[in-house]
Amino acid sequence: MTTVQNLGGPCIELKHSLPSEVAAISPSVDKVMLLIRECGCVADGETDVEIALREALANAVIHGNHQNPRKNVHIRCCCKPDEVTIAVKDEGRGFDINKVADPTAPENTGSVHGRGIYLMKAFMDEVHFEEGGVVVRMRKSSSQAAKKDSLK
């Protein structure tokens, strides 16, 4: 289910739920990215947002919900004129961010897994884990907004 609302202020919000299936990730990313492109909130950072969103959804489906067909993943995306915030919530038990292995450590560089959180943090301006790790909240500002802020 997907809903899009103009909340009366600067935020256009999309709420979307997807089943815990890997095949549902790409169509869900496409829906969110369509809104982001139409809003033009981070035109210079769309690819970064898309990569981070894919990683967040993959983590939620695979690690959070363990691809359990009875569980869903929930997305909330808020597009403002110069930024986008995205929250991804799974129905799993959560995790301790401090116990996640560093993918840049020599013993982990050969692994084919374990880079999702690293990529989210690399491509987004802010990444926070909430509610014991079942929610990841990410924010990306446009580079134009960052330039305006640096002039203040």
Regions found by a protein language model. Give the residues of each.
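Two-component histidine phosphotransfer core
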Residues: 26-30, 128
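STAS-typified acidic loop motif
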Residues: 14-27
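Conserved short strand/loop->alpha-helix "switch" segment adjacent to the catalytic nucleotide/phosphoryl-transfer site
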Residues: 30-54, 109-110
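Alpha-helical macromolecular-interaction surfaces
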Residues: 27, 48-51, 83, 122
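Short alpha-helix lining the ATP-binding pocket of the histidine-kinase-like ATPase
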Residues: 54, 58, 62
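Conserved beta-strand-loop-beta-strand hairpin that lines the nucleotide-binding pocket
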Residues: 1-15, 61-152
